Structure formats: structure tokens, C-alpha cells
């Protein structure tokens, strides 16, 4: 059993990134978002809590506003939290109790390996949807909802086709136009994401997909990242013209067809939004629960400003 005093708070410059990344790679609950290169790209600042000799780690992604330090969830990083082998309830709670006191506000999402039943601190639960692709395509597609099957057929009957040559810039632009005002992504997050994409693309861990019409206009597009036998549906760029003809349905179906019968999980990255959950579930995806942590120790007058 560990104790909180075995968990060290390290500033960014003190982190041994080779040991850090080895921990993320070998953790049963490891996720791509936890790697140092991912955090370096997407977090405004990040420090860390480290157990022993990097037996378990937790990134502390932080920023500062009105003179107060706070922990926040970076863009395009759905789940962080504690990563490591042999995690117990006590270890996870020790990490949560080891935040430096300077962080007056905590609003972060942990990962599915951090669930603690009966804990008040970890009582806020969120939904992700995942689809195991370790079956033949014919078997997976049989589980599609009938409405999804009709939408997929409609898109291809209208002459749409799959493209894997769509540029990251076009996907980012579509994402900006359709989603930036909804999900709170900041303008500076996009060049950081592009840098991350290029890094992963060069190591064979990023792919782009699109559904285009007969004139090669992009109707639906997405970027997928790969790690830990997962394919992350990381960024979506859809055109309004594709919504009524099933372009997004056709895109996911094309990805599943290409990656079926592999030891791979398609990670949809959410969602608590009913319509998105319905969309993901329609492909046979199942719910994966993960906890979120909210702690507010801000002075009352700052809480008013935050509202």
C-alpha cells in the first residue's frame, strides 16, 4: 500500500520524460493523451504527480487567471487522471489528495481506470463509447441500427466515396466552422493540434478520412490517432450538406470496414450529449464510464466572476 508522502509533485522541468512515457506505454489504462509529447502540444502548462520511480503518474494541466492557479482539461484530450500498473482505490485517492494547495480550482476528466465506487470525490461520472473491432466486418455491421444502415446506403447511392487524402488543414477548418463556438476550443489550440498531428503522422499513428461527393467536395471528415490498441476519433470536420445524406455514418462505416478483425478499439471520445451517444451506440458501441473531478476553493468573489 502506498501513502501520499510517496507521491511527489514535480514541476515540468523536473519530469523525466523517458520514464514518464514508459509508464504511460506500460500502464493497462494508458491513453495517448498522457504522453509527454501530447501534453507538451496541447496543455498550456503541465506539471505532475509521480508515485515512487514513475510507478504511477498524473499530469497536472494548469493555467492561471485573476492571479489564481487552476487545473483544467486541455483541448483534444478527453481523459487524463492517474496512469500506472496495479492502481488501487487508495493510490488513486492519494493522488487526488496530493494536489498542491495553490490550485484553487480543479475541473478535470480522469480515465476509466480511475473509477472508485462509493467515493464522494469521484461521484461525477461521464460517458464514453467504444467499439471492439476484433471481429469480421460482416459481424460488426450486423449490429448497426437500421437507421444507420439506411444512412450509409443513402450516402453511397448518391455517389459519395471514401477519401483518405483529405488535408489536416481542411478538417481543422471545418471543425472551426462547425464546433468551435460549441466546445470552447481556443484559436491557439488548432496550430498546436496540427503540430501534434504532424508528429503522429510521421510515426504512422495518425490518419485522415473523408466522405466526398461526386465533385470531391468534403461532406464529412475526421482525424484518427492510434495508441494502446485504440483508434481515437479525435477531430471531426463535417459540412452541413453532408448531414442529411448520412455522410458521417458512411465515414465511420468505412473506418470500421478497413480496421475490422484487428486487435483494436474504436474510441468515440464521448458523449454525455444524447444525440452523439445515439449516433455512437448505433454502430454497436458500448458505454465506458470515466470519472471527472471538480473542486472549487476559489474566494467567493472570484466564483461570481467565473459564473
Model-found features: residue ranges?
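Active-site/acyl-donor-binding loops of N-acyltransferases
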Residues: 2, 62-68, 113, 119-139, ...
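A conserved beta-strand-loop-helix scaffold within acyl/acetyltransferase catalytic domains
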Residues: 2-53, 58-67, 110-243
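Short, high-confidence coil segments that cap the C-terminus of an alpha-helix
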Residues: 44-46, 101-103, 206, 261-263
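Short, hydrophobic beta-strand segments that form beta-sheet elements in well-ordered domains
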Residues: 49-50, 104-110, 266-268
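Conserved acyl-donor/pantetheine-binding loop and adjacent beta-alpha core of acyl/acetyltransferases
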Residues: 64-79
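The substrate-binding groove and active-site-proximal loops of carbohydrate-active enzymes
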Residues: 78-86
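Non-catalytic accessory segments adjacent to catalytic cores
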Residues: 89-125
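Aromatic (often tryptophan-rich) hydrophobic motifs at membrane interfaces
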Residues: 93-94, 198-199, 205-303
Amino acid at each position: 500500500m502506498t501513502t501520499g508522502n510517496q507521491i511527489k509533485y514535480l514541476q515540468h522541468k523536473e519530469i523525466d520524460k523517458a520514464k514518464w512515457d514508459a509508464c504511460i506505454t506500460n500502464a493497462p489504462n494508458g491513453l495517448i493523451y498522457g504522453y509527454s509529447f501530447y501534453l507538451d502540444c496541447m496543455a498550456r502548462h503541465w506539471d505532475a504527480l509521480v508515485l515512487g520511480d514513475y510507478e504511477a503518474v498524473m499530469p497536472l494541466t494548469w493555467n492561471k487567471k485573476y492571479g489564481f492557479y487552476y487545473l483544467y482539461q486541455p483541448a483534444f484530450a478527453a481523459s487524463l487522471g492517474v496512469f500506472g500498473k496495479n492502481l488501487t482505490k487508495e493510490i488513486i485517492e492519494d493522488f487526488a489528495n496530493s494536489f498542491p494547495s495553490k490550485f484553487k480550482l480543479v475541473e478535470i476528466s480522469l480515465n476509466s481506470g480511475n473509477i472508485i465506487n462509493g467515493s464522494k470525490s469521484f461521484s461525477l461520472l461521464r460517458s464514453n463509447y467504444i467499439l471492439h473491432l476484433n471481429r469480421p466486418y460482416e459481424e460488426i455491421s450486423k449490429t448497426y441500427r437500421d437507421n444507420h444502415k439506411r444512412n450509409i446506403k443513402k450516402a453511397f447511392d448518391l455517389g459519395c466515396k471514401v477519401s483518405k487524402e483529405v488535408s489536416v488543414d481542411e478538417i481543422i477548418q471545418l471543425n472551426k466552422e462547425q464546433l468551435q463556438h460549441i466546445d470552447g476550443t481556443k484559436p491557439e489550440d488548432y496550430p498546436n493540434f496540427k503540430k501534434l498531428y504532424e508528429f503522429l503522422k510521421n510515426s504512422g499513428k495518425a490518419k485522415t478520412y473523408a466522405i466526398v461527393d461526386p465533385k470531391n467536395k468534403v461532406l464529412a471528415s475526421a482525424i484518427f490517432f492510434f495508441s494502446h490498441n485504440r483508434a481515437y476519433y479525435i477531430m471531426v470536420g463535417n459540412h452541413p450538406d453532408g448531414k442529411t445524406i448520412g455522410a458521417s455514418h458512411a465515414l465511420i462505416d468505412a473506418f470500421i470496414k478497413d480496421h475490422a478483425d484487428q486487435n483494436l478499439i474504436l474510441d468515440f471520445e464521448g458523449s454525455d450529449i444524447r444525440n452523439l451517444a445515439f449516433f455512437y451506440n448505433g454502430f454497436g458501441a458500448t458505454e465506458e464510464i470515466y470519472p471527472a473531478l471538480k473542486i472549487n476553493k476559489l474566494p467567493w468573489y472570484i466564483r461570481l466572476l467565473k459564473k
